[in-house]
Swiss-Prot record:
Residues 244-258 have a biased composition (Acidic residues). It holds the Pfam family TFIID-31kDa. The lineage of its organism: Eukaryota, Metazoa, Chordata, Craniata, Vertebrata. InterPro entries: Histone-fold, TFIID-31, TFIID_subunit_9. This is Transcription initiation factor TFIID subunit 9B. The modification Phosphothreonine is found at residues 159, 174. GO terms for cellular component: transcription factor TFIID complex; transcription factor TFTC complex. Binds TAF5 and TAF6. Component of TFIID and the TATA-binding protein-free TAF complex (TFTC). TFIID is composed of TATA binding protein (TBP) and a number of TBP-associated factors (TAFs). Binds N-terminal domain of p53/TP53 which is essential for transcription. GO terms for biological process: DNA-templated transcription initiation; negative regulation of apoptotic process; negative regulation of transcription by RNA polymerase II; positive regulation of cell growth; programmed cell death; protein stabilization; response to thiabendazole; transcription by RNA polymerase II. The keyword Phosphoprotein applies. Keywords: Acetylation, Nucleus, Phosphoprotein, Transcription, Transcription regulation.
Length: 258
C-alpha cells in the first residue's frame, strides 16, 4: 500500500498513535487506516470486560477497592474462556508415552493391502444397508375372484332359468330380483285309498315355471307320481276274492254239462 495510508495522521488521537506504534514494533507495516479503529475497539471492549470481572471478584472477596490480584485473576479466567492455547509439552509427552506402550494389532495374512483388522481401520464401514421390500398394490389383501360357468349338479338346488325378453304392449316390466321357492306337492293317481299302503319307488318330476308368467318369484313344484306297479299291488283284496269265486262257479258249470 501507499506510505501515506500506513503513516498515522499527526492530528490523530493519542490512543491511535500508540496502536500504530505497537503495530510498527511488531513488524506490521502494511495495513489500512481502518485497522487502527478496529484494534482500538477491540482493546476498549477487552479492557472493559477485564475490569468488570475484577470488580466482581473484589466484591466477592469483600475488598474496598480493586487491586492487581483481582485484575490478574480476571485476565486468567478470561484467557481460559476466550483464547485457546496448546497444552504443555510435558503433558503431550506423557500421553504419547502411554499410547506407544500399546502393541499394534496383527496384520491379516493374505494378499492385498496389509491392513489391520476392520475394527482398527478408519476406512471400515460402520453401517449396514437394509434392503427395503416394496409391497405391490395387490399384495397383502384378498382379491375377489369370480368363477364363471361353474354350475352345481346337486338335485336339491333349484336352477334359475335364463332371463327372456317378454314384450308387453301396455306395461313395461321393471327389473326385479328373482328368488326361487320350492314347494313339494303330492298328486295321487286314483281316488281309492288302499287299506295297507306298501312302500314303492316313486319318480320325482320337477316343474319349472317361468317367473315372467307369475311375477317376481320363481316357484319350483315337485310332484310325487305313484307308479302303476304300486297301484296294481295295492288293489282291494275283497275284489280279488270275489273274482276267484266267479272263476270257481264257471268251472262247476262246465263240469255239469259234461
Amino acid at each position: 500500500m501507499e506510505p501515506s495510508k500506513m503513516a498515522p495522521l499527526k492530528n490523530a488521537p493519542r490512543d491511535a498513535l500508540v496502536m500504530a506504534q505497537i503495530l510498527k514494533d511488531m513488524g506490521i507495516t502494511d495495513y489500512e487506516p481502518r485497522v487502527i479503529n478496529q484494534m482500538l475497539e477491540f482493546a476498549f471492549r477487552y479492557v472493559t470486560t477485564i475490569l468488570d470481572d475484577a470488580k466482581i471478584y473484589s466484591s466477592h472477596a469483600k475488598k474496598p477497592t480493586v487491586d492487581a490480584d483481582d485484575v490478574r485473576l480476571a485476565i486468567q479466567c478470561r484467557a481460559d474462556q476466550s483464547f485457546t492455547s496448546p497444552p504443555p509439552r510435558d503433558f503431550l509427552l506423557d500421553i504419547a508415552r502411554q499410547k506407544n506402550q500399546t502393541p499394534l494389532p496383527l496384520i491379516k495374512p493374505y494378499a492385498g493391502p496389509r491392513l489391520p483388522p476392520d475394527r482398527y481401520c478408519l476406512t471400515a464401514p460402520n453401517y449396514r444397508l437394509k434392503s427395503l421390500v416394496k409391497k405391490g398394490p395387490n399384495q397383502g389383501r384378498l382379491v375377489p375372484r369370480l368363477s364363471v360357468g361353474a354350475v352345481s349338479s346337486r338335485p336339491t338346488t333349484p336352477t334359475v332359468a335364463p332371463p327372456q325378453a317378454v314384450s308387453v304392449p301396455n306395461k313395461v316390466a321393471t327389473p326385479v330380483s328373482v328368488t326361487s321357492q320350492r314347494f313339494a306337492v303330492q298328486i295321487p293317481t286314483s281316488q281309492s285309498t288302499p287299506a295297507k299302503p306298501a312302500p314303492a319307488a316313486t319318480s320325482v318330476q320337477n316343474v319349472l315355471i317361468n317367473p315372467s308368467m307369475i311375477g317376481s318369484k320363481n316357484i319350483l313344484i315337485t310332484t310325487n307320481m305313484v307308479s302303476s306297479q304300486s297301484t296294481a299291488t295295492d288293489s282291494n283284496p275283497l275284489k280279488r276274492k270275489h273274482d276267484d269265486d266267479d272263476d270257481d262257479d264257471d268251472d262247476d258249470d262246465d263240469n255239469d254239462t259234461m
